[in-house]
């Protein structure tokens, strides 16, 4: 039963995020907000809502290990599995903006997270630093997008009442789904004798990263594999700056020695994909398989440690 509740929680998270994005994007279009800005803000933040709900809920419930390990695990999964799988399906050329900007920012925020948790706590001040970084990151994206701006296409929008219904139901599903996911994950951890860190790094982080994986696989099958790298790295940056920033600002998050070690692994993975990206212009199938194998090895390690 508890496993079904975990699945239910994750389904609610994904559907809630989907409804919230659709409703919010329609409101933004009615207000004549350019689609490029909608994509860089509402949609980008919307794809991180499952992780946000789980981490914020876990922090408020005192499940600090899940709050941090969920984000670290999601970022490692995004980097190695989401990008790796896309490369295996369809090799793709590297985007210069991602290589020269996003991958470097990804490394920087990963290092910053590791430094912040070294004292065993991610406090409110450090959370606010992340949130300031988030604002700067989004402003930089918007400025960059405006340089390459294209004409907005006519897109059908929802009615005012539908927008409100979508947003309200979406938020309700996200909150309820986050609560169910954290509660059931803790019960599963207790039943199987697993730590909160292990359940956060595996089941919860993979579950909340499924939207990114599904989106990237669909993009790869349509010959748009290059989008997966931007989506994965952008999601990683949002996860740290937005989710851990908001979570620790609301309620300081304690970090265990395992959490601290896993942030070092995240730095290593961030450097790995940067090195792979720098070495040649194409993300080949061999590189994709290598990245997936690295993730499998990491999974084996955290289960037996």
Label the model's feature ranges.
Residues 1-305:
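Hydrophobic alpha-helical segments, chiefly the membrane-spanning helices
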């Amino acid at each position: 039963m508890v496993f079904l509740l975990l699945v239910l929680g994750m389904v609610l998270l994904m559907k809630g995020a989907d409804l919230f994005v659709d409703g919010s994007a329609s409101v933004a279009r009615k207000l004549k907000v350019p689609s490029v800005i909608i994509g860089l803000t509402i949609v980008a933040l919307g794809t991180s809502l499952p992780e946000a709900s789980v981490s914020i809920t876990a922090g408020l419930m005192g499940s600090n290990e899940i709050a941090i390990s969920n984000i670290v695990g999601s970022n490692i999964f995004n980097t190695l599995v989401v990008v790796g799988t896309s490369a295996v399906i369809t090799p793709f050329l590297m985007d210069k903006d991602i290589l020269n900007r996003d991958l470097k920012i990804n490394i920087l925020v990963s290092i910053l997270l590791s430094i912040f948790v070294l004292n065993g706590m991610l406090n409110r001040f450090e959370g606010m630093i992340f949130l300031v970084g988030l604002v700067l990151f989004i402003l930089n994206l918007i400025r960059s997008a405006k340089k390459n701006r294209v004409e907005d296409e006519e897109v059908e929008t929802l009615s005012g009442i539908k927008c409100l219904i979508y947003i309200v139901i979406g938020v309700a599903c996200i909150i309820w789904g986050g609560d169910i996911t954290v509660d059931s994950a803790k019960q599963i951890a207790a039943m199987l004798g697993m730590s909160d860190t292990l359940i956060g790094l595996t089941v919860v982080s993979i579950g909340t990263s499924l939207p990114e994986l599904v989106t990237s696989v669909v993009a790869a099958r349509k010959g748009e594999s290059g989008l997966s790298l931007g989506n994965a790295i952008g999601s990683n940056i949002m996860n740290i700056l937005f989710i851990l920033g908001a979570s620790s600002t609301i309620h300081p998050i304690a970090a265990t020695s395992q959490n601290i070690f896993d942030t070092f692994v995240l730095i290593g993975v961030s450097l790995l994909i940067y090195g792979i990206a720098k070495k040649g212009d194409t993300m080949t199938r061999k590189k994709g398989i290598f990245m997936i194998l690295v993730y499998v090895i990491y999974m084996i390690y955290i289960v037996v440690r």
